[in-house]
Structure formats: C-alpha cells, structure tokens
Amino acid sequence: PGRGGHTMGMAASREVYRCRETAAEFFHLDNPGQVVFTLNCTMAMNMALKGILRTSGRVVVSDLEHNAVMRPLHVLSPGRPIYDVAQVTPGDDDQTVEAFRRCITPFTRAIVCTHASNVFGVQLPIRRLGELAREHDLLFVVDAAQTAGVLPLDMEADHIDFLCVAGHKGLYGPMGTGMLLCGDRFQLPSFVEGGTGSQSLLYEQPDELPDRLESGTPNTPGICGLRA
C-alpha cells in the first residue's frame, strides 16, 4: 500500500511499528523506535562499524568473525590498522575474555564479536564480554546472525549497545530482512539519506531513530513476515 496518510498506508505503518515493538520486547530493548530494519545482518553490521569508526579509533574482534565484520574493517583501514584480534579458546571462557582484555588499548572504541561462529558453532561468552566492555567504557557490538531466535539474547543484561540480526535464520522471517537494535550510549550517523515519510520539508536527514537510519521505501511485506 505504500506510505502516506491514507487508510492502507497508515495500516501498513502500524504493522511495521508492531514489529518494532515485538523485536524490542524479544531482545530487551526499552524503546521500539530504536529498532532499525535493514536488508540483512551484513547491512546492520556495516551501519554499526562505519558509524563507530567514522573518524578514528580501533575495535577488538575475535578470530572467528564473519566477513560481514572483517570486510568493512578492511575497507575502513587502508594505511591505518583499526582492529586487534582476540583468540577464542573453545571451552575456556576465562581465557577468551582475557584474550579480549589484552587487546584493549587507549584507542579502542568497541568490542565487536559474533555470538556464535557460523563455521565452527563455537559460542562466545557475550555477557562477560559485555561486562568487559562496560568496565573499560567501550561500546559492545554483537553479530547475532546465527543465534537470534535460537539462543537467549538480552541487550540490557548482556550490555549490548548494537545488536545485528538476520531475519531469515533463527527468526524464521523472509530473506532480505534484518535488524539493527540500537542502545542509548552512542548515536550512529545516517548511513543512507533520503525520504523517510517524515519531516519532508527538511533537506537534512531527521535526527531521531529510526528515521535517521531508515531511508526510502521500507520492505513492509518482509517486515510483517518477520513479525509473523
């Protein structure tokens, strides 16, 4: 039905918002407006990484990261290395956490890690890594492509600032759907600018979420399928 003030457009907008509410409740995020719909988990991760590292800084990643993490980091790092790699020790969370701790420098801005490897199935101790991030006043970004809908995820208890989710895996949604759930500790800049169905008289991208990170016609059928 498209967007707009007509009956079908408003009904579609309400359905999209219901999906935000469902996702926020499921992943323990207080504000449904901070649920951003994306094409996939890869897009969500690009939005988080390129926003956090837009000007400077480094991140700590695990040695099990997907290319959705590593390729954006390589694009961001010509001539200036911007990540340190922590070795995961399967079956020994203490060693894994200490490996991340050793990689933290005064220039580190975030810990970025997968919840579980798509190759080996190794699960990382994200709650402890989230605690480590808070201990050092770092952001915590989690790639939950493999685990959302399969393993428990609690953005508040796990201290997650940005949760990147695929819709078509454990959430049983359509392909071509994903989400970036955003906490309050860091404001990502706009990623793609354009129409949002709001504040149309302004040339500037709206500052509030989700409009700051959602431009163009949304995938309303896919989003509704994700909620279903």
PLM region descriptions:
Residues 1-228:
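Pyridoxal 5′-phosphate
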